[in-house]
């Protein structure tokens, strides 16, 4: 079982949980405040970060995509969590796309630094 240790998962609060879709997951194990979760396959919009501290620019680029900055001008619902992969030489921010979409249904991003990726089922460590 692969565990993605370098992924920081930013979890939404209770108020967002009622209005924002989250990927389905099952709890595998809890170790103190850390949960090992098995997530199903998803699609992510991703953008590189200039550094591991540049999350606001990445968030703006991804928000631009879901708020109509795409080849159809279509708005896409916000989901949770927002992900940051904090590998020093290649940090990335990602938004999970709503489950109603397939890769064929999603409009292409207008911003060349935003790309779409199929993410297979995976195990993630999350701070609960």
Residue ranges and their predicted role:
Residues 3-12:
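Sec-dependent N-terminal signal peptides
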């Amino acid at each position: 079982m692969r565990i993605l240790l370098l992924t920081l998962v930013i979890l939404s609060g209770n108020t967002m949980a009622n209005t924002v879709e989250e990927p389905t997951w099952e709890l595998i194990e809890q170790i103190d405040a850390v949960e090992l979760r098995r997530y199903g396959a998803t699609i992510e919009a991703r953008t590189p970060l200039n550094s591991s501290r540049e999350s606001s620019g990445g968030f703006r680029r991804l928000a631009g995509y879901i708020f109509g900055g795409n080849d159809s001008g279509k708005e896409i619902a916000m989901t949770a969590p927002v992900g940051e992969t904090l590998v020093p030489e290649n940090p990335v921010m990602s938004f999970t796309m709503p489950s109603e979409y397939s890769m064929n249904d999603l409009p292409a991003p207008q911003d060349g630094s935003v790309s779409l990726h199929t993410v297979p089922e995976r195990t993630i460590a999350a701070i609960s």
